[in-house]
Amino acid sequence: MSTSILRRILDPTRKPKPDAILSISLLTTVSSPPSPPSDPLISDAVSILTHHRSKSRWSTLRSLQPSGFTPSQFSEITLCLRNNPHLSLRFFLFTRRYSLCSHDTHSCSTLIHILSRSRLKSHASEIIRLALRLAATDEDEDRVLKVFRSLIKSYNRCGSAPFVFDLLIKSCLDSKEIDGAVMVMRKLRSRGINAQISTCNALITEVSRRRGASNGYKMYREVFGLDDVSVDEAKKMIGKIKPNATTFNSMMVSFYREGETEMVERIWREMEEEVGCSPNVYSYNVLMEAYCARGLMSEAEKVWEEMKVRGVVYDIVAYNTMIGGLCSNFEVVKAKELFRDMGLKGIECTCLTYEHLVNGYCKAGDVDSGLVVYREMKRKGFEADGLTIEALVEGLCDDRDGQRVVEAADIVKDAVREAMFYPSRNCYELLVKRLCEDGKMDRALNIQAEMVGKGFKPSQETYRAFIDGYGIVGDEETSALLAIEMAESLKLRAEEES
């Protein structure tokens, strides 16, 4: 049976019969042990490797063949060791270390098969990447195609496992050989042989990441044959590699990142209606985030309720998604209710949970509640990000109470010292302006000095703030001098830019 399948792969002119659609999981080979080698060198090498102690086998092996082994000889020796894949790998590394074999795709393929059939995934993948590098020296043939053909030709003799083709596709993806991975998938699929679902998902994800969500979606349709036949027939044809939630989650995330939130909804409908796949909590989270990003909170809340009806357990990501969406859309009261619900269910908050609430309160003009959450956040050992701190600063500076700007300056000072916070120019200028308006010139000068130390040259707005500030406290002389300095500075800056 395996010989027939391999012939179908190697011969591009042959077309499989309609009833010959086989899963790659059926491509298994049970071969008899290799016949005794006719070359005495090979039998001697096998004997040394299998019967000598580990400390002596390598020196004895070098004495046996100082000039090294040909790739063909290496393959024959390794075939005799195929039931001991770790020894086969050590033999390979030994020949590489002492330059005892000029390995090619043929010798690498033998070892790849032996490692694959023993599920030594990482080692097999490493040898596949080496084979791809060795194949790159041949300018007349695509290197991935060359390795693929070599694996096919040696498949039966090595008693390999279909898993080897999945490793080849994934190794191509790791090496950024997208075209090569697609080519292997197409060659297998054209003969009715399917890769594992994890391999299909990896291919779709990588195409989406490197070539855009739309191309990833096209690859999904091709991999699962959804454009070849009717939907009902496609469901039958997919068989054992029916797309799973991970497949759809990957595509939804890709479209969401590109801002195509309507496509997120389309993928969701295909998942449920066309393929009949059940979404998981991650799927719901992505859909809710897509609605929240568009401000469609009523739709997001419907998804939230659907999760409850279907018995999908909310995780921290689900809570953070809804809390963030509600806070961004001025529904901080509902967000606070979800926050309390988290506590009742024993779900630990994350830094992001608190940041959403702080930003939500500040956006709604309730900076005092934002400060309460911020202080609770710090008590629990979380450090807010820059946007959250600047939201607090803006909220405090909008309050005309003179002490609030001092509170804002203290928050920035502590954040710079404790959390490696780097205020933006706008943050510095806002503090300077409000301090000057309240006549707190010494504190404003300290902020301005720190601002210059961070590489922010005084702008016209900064000069204006100090000029007005010194005027407020009655220091007209300093105010006038700053006006002259500002004019000279702006003139010099204009000359430098021209």
Swiss-Prot record:
The keyword 4Fe-4S does not apply. PPR repeats lie at residues 244-274, 280-314, 315-349, 350-384, 385-423, 424-458, 459-489. Keywords: Repeat. Belongs to the PPR family. P subfamily. It holds the Pfam family PPR. The keyword Iron does not apply. Transmembrane segments: none annotated. This is Pentatricopeptide repeat-containing protein At2g15980. Gene3D superfamilies: Tetratricopeptide repeat domain. InterPro entries: Pentatricopeptide_rpt (IPR002885), TPR-like_helical_dom_sf (IPR011990). PROSITE patterns: PPR.
